[in-house]
Every structure is written in C-alpha cells, then in structure tokens.
C-alpha cells in the first residue's frame, strides 16, 4: 500500500514538473509593440550609443575651449648640485688698483701684502642651488582665436547632437522595417495555414467524388501537388521568421528571440481606418517643404558656419598676439635666499609665417565657398526627397486599396469556381488557379500594408516630423 502511494505521488510530481517546464517558456515570452521595439532599439543599439558618446565628447571639448579665456598659471622648480661651480673666473687684484692708490699702498703695506696683491685669485660660484617660480599669463589679444575657437567648439557640439538625431532616425527606421517584415512573414504564414485548411477541405471533396466515380484521380493528384507546394512555402516562411527574429533581437538589444509582437491583426479594418484618416493625418502641408526643420539641412548649415569660423581662425593665426602676466620668483644661487615679484607684457608678431599663412587663409575661403554651394545643392535634393516621400505614400496607399479590392474579387472567384467544380461545370485546374489567385491576393495585401507603413515612416522622417 505504501509503495502504491509513493508511486502515485511520484506520478503526480512528474505531471506537475512536466506542466511547469512545458508552460514556463510560454509564460516567459514577452510581447512587444512597435513603439516598444523602437524604444528598445534607441536604448540598446550601438550606433545610438556611439553617437551619444560623441555628444558627450563634444561637450567636454566645448568646456575645454572655454578655459582659454582664463589666465594660464604655471609653476617651475629646480634644484641642482654640480661637481664644480658653474660660474668660475680668475682675477688679479693689482689690476683693479689705480696708480694713484698704488703709491700710497706701497708705502703703508708690508712687502708680503704687496706681493699677495699681485697673485691671481680664483672665484667659483653656483655649485648648488634652488630656483622656483610661479607665473600667470593672461592673453589680451590673440587675433580672435580664443573667441572663434569657442564658437567652433559650440558648433561641434551642435553637430554631434544633430548626428545623434540622425542616428536615432536611422535606427528607428531600421527597427520598424524589421518589425513590419516580421509582421508580413507572420501574416503570410497565417495565409498559408488558411490555404492549407482550404486545400484539405477541397481534398476531402475530391476524394469523395473520386470514390463515387464522378471525378478523376488526376484531380486528387493536383490537389496533393498544391499541398506539397504549400508545405514548401511554410518551411521557407518558418526560416524567414526565424532569421528576422534574430536580426530584430540583435538590433534592438533583446535578450533572446522568444518574444512575440503585438499589432493590429485586422489588416482590412486598418486599411479602412487609414483610408478615413489619410486626408486628416497625411495631407501635404507647408511644413513638408520647410527644409529648415530637417536635421540634414541644419547639419549643412553648421558645416557652413564651421568653415567660416575656420577661415577666421586662419586669419587670426597670422595676427600679433598680446599677453600680460605676473610672477613670483625665488633662488639661492648666491648662497643666500632671494625672492622677488614681477609683471610683464609680451607681444608676438609672426613675420615669416605670413607667407604660408596667406595661402592657408585662401584655402579656408575656398572651403567656405564650397560649403555654401553644397548647402544650396543639397537643399534642392532635400526638397526632391520630400516630394518623392509624399509620392511614395500616395502610391503605396493606392496599392493597398487595390490589394483590398483584389482580395474581395479573388474570394468571390474562389467561391464561384468551387461551386462550379462541385456542379461539374469546371475543371480542377480552374479551381486550383482560383485558389492560387486568392493566396497571391492575400500575400500582395500583406506586402502592400507593410510597404505602406514603411512609406509613412519615410515620409515622417523626410519632412522632419
């Protein structure tokens, strides 16, 4: 009795463990909407992180340039000990005694002292010592290099922020493309499942007809061939879904591929909703042609501004620089402590550099003019891109409406051919062709819907929305 109870407990425990490990992955699956996918990509994608690092580096560079407005303070210290004095000389005291004084000295000094005055004397100084100084230099005029350098650093920070926005737009676009590609493949898989169910029903009808002797076995073989084709399509779609999941997971920084995506499954209803809101949401307006709101245009403007500042910097490098300063110094070179303070002014005038500097200024002027013309040229291209994006939205929307009507027509055509075949007035090839047209209309509708969503995103980005 005890053994039987133990076996029952083991079986119950085994069932519980089986259910736990069977349903745990399903419950652990996360569901992502399109916005969540884009948010995850913006947070985890390497391109966006790299652009953010660029913004932070540009900010530090701007702060570094700001310090040039303030005095430059430096300190210097030196201690030395030489093997002999660095200042050495030999002097004869008699050479420094004037002739008028020599007569009186000869009369008053003994002969030994007079003889000593004629011997050379060696003098040695600065064998060891300590030197220290503290200097502060304030630039007064530097040819505008400090001011223009700070402006250029600010432009660099603005450029890095614009590049971050462009990186975010590109990442958002790619993530949404992957999302709708996965939606398209999943919807096609649903179509394959629906067609497979339809073919199974047709197979049952044909099998009954063949057994009754009112249909040929060839009809049954045609249905089986079409079923094999559907199985082949299912395998390709499964592989495609797996690859897109991997790409989406890597691009958005998701931990694994065991996730599902949430979207409006009723494509037909969404198309009708889009048709009603199209005129309200995506009508061409004045903002569409306002290129100044685009990051690409602003980036070109910053390029012109940077070229102009670089030209001014080249001019400033050939102008005189003026600075004032103050310092405090200490030394004990003469074996006694000595300290003193001082103020000074410096003027530096480039002379030979003017020759090469004049060519540098001309080169910067050419680069500035090139940036101006590039701005004009790319502005026209941005206008064309806006118009092309709007045309793409209109075209994809019309394609979507056509695909919607094609589904209705293909559905009715399939219904009629199925009734005709049952009545014996149509061939199996006509019925299978109607089934193929129905499947193609569903797939085209799925592709048109995904393309419409991508075109809307391109339009929003092309118009700076």
Sequence positions of predicted segments:
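Bacterial Sec-dependent N-terminal signal peptides
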Residues: 1-35, 40-42, 452
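Bacterial Sec-pathway N-terminal export signals of envelope proteins
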Residues: 28-86, 140, 255-308, 351, ...
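A glycine-/polar-enriched beta->alpha junction
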Residues: 39-49, 56-71, 122-126, 134-151, ...
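Acidic, low-complexity, intrinsically disordered peripheral segments
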Residues: 74, 81-97, 256-259, 444-465
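Small/polar, glycine/serine/threonine/aspartate-rich low-complexity segments that form flexible
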Residues: 76-135, 265-278, 325-360
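Amphipathic alpha-helical coiled-coil segments
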Residues: 50-65, 167, 173-190, 201, ...
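Periplasmic alpha-helical coiled-coil/stalk elements that build and connect Gram-negative outer-membrane
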Residues: 2-3, 60-62, 164-291, 392, ...
């Amino acid at each position: 009795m005890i053994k039987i109870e133990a076996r029952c407990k083991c079986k119950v425990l085994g069932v519980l463990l089986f259910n736990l490990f069977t349903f745990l992955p399903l419950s652990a699956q996360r569901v992502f909407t399109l916005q969540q996918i884009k948010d995850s990509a913006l947070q985890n994608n390497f391109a966006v992180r790299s652009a953010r690092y660029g913004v932070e580096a540009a900010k530090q560079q701007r702060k570094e340039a700001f310090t040039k407005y303030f005095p430059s303070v430096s300190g210097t210290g030196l201690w030395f000990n030489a093997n002999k004095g660095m200042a050495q000389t030999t002097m004869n005291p008699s050479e420094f005694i004037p002739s008028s004084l020599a007569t009186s000295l000869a009369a008053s000094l003994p002969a030994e002292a007079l003889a000593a005055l004629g011997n050379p004397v060696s003098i040695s100084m600065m064998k060891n010592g300590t030197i220290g100084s503290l200097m502060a230099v304030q630039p007064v005029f530097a040819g505008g290099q400090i001011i223009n350098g700070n402006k250029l650093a600010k432009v660099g920070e603005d450029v890095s922020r614009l590049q971050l926005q462009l990186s975010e737009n590109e990442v958002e676009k790619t993530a949404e493309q992957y999302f709708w590609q996965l939606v398209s493949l999943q919807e096609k898989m649903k179509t394959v499942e629906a067609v497979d169910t339809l073919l199974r029903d047709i197979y049952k009808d044909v099998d009954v007809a063949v057994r009754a002797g009112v249909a040929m076995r060839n009809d049954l073989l045609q249905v089986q061939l079409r079923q094999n084709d559907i199985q082949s399509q299912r395998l390709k779609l499964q592989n495609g879904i797996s690859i897109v999941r991997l790409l989406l997971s890597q691009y958005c920084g998701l931990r694994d591929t065991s996730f599902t995506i949430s979207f409006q499954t009723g494509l037909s209803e969404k198309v009708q909703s889009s048709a009603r809101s199209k005129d309200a949401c995506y009508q061409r307006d004045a903002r569409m042609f306002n290129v100044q709101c685009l990051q690409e245009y602003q980036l070109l403007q910053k390029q012109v501004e940077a070229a102009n500042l670089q030209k001014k910097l080249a001019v400033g490098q050939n102008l005189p620089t003026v600075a004032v300063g103050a310092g405090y110094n200490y030394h004990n070179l003469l074996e006694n402590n000595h300290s003193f303070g001082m103020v000074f002014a410096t003027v530096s005038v480039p002379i030979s550099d003017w020759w090469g500097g004049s060519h540098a200024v001309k080169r910067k002027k050419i680069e500035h003019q090139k940036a101006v013309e590039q701005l004009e040229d790319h502005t026209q291209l941005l206008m064309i891109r806006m118009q092309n994006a709007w045309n793409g939205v209109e075209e994809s929307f019309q394609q979507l409406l056509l695909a919607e009507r094609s589904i209705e027509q293909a559905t009715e055509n399939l219904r009629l051919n199925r009734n005709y075949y049952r009545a014996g007035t149509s061939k199996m090839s006509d019925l299978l062709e109607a089934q193929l047209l129905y499947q193609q209309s569903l797939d085209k509708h799925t592709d048109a819907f995904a393309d419409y969503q991508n075109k809307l995103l391109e339009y929003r980005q092309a118009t700076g929305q």
